[in-house]
């Protein structure tokens, strides 16, 4: 009984952590337009106060600005 409850709690914690780490990518799926270029998309991402904007720009299929992303 305790083993089952522990396993359930563990699964809930892992699922919560995984969903929190993907916030920027989830936002990318919701937003259909963020600019014509990678630099515009990066600026839009920063205006939205999102984190991991370089990954966000790559995820939507653009090249992030070289001076901001490595």
Curated annotation (Swiss-Prot):
Cysteines joined through disulfide linkages: 34-41, 45-53, 54-69
Citing just one GO molecular function, the answer is: toxin activity
Q: Where would you find this protein in the cell?
A: Secreted
Q: Where is the signal peptide?
A: 1-22
Q: In which tissues is it expressed?
A: Expressed by the venom duct.
Recorded GO CC terms: extracellular region
Positions of the propeptide removed during maturation = 23-30
Does the keyword Signal feature in the UniProt annotation? yes
Primary subcellular site in the record, as a coarse category: secreted
Q: Which UniProt keywords apply?
A: Cleavage on pair of basic residues, Disulfide bond, Neurotoxin, Secreted, Signal, Toxin
Q: What's the domain remark here?
A: The cysteine framework is XXIII (C-C-C-CC-C).
Family to which this protein belongs? Belongs to the conotoxin K superfamily.
Q: What is the protein's known function?
A: Probable neurotoxin.
Protein name as it appears in the record: Conotoxin Im23.4
The species this protein was found in:
Conus imperialis (Imperial cone)
């Amino acid at each position: 009984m305790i083993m089952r409850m522990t396993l359930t709690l563990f699964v809930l914690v892992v699922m919560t952590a995984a969903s929190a780490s993907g916030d920027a990518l989830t936002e990318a799926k919701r937003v259909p337009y963020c600019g014509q270029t990678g630099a515009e998309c990066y600026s839009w991402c920063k205006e939205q106060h999102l984190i991991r904007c370089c990954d966000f720009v790559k995820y939507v299929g653009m090249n992030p600005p070289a001076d901001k992303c490595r």
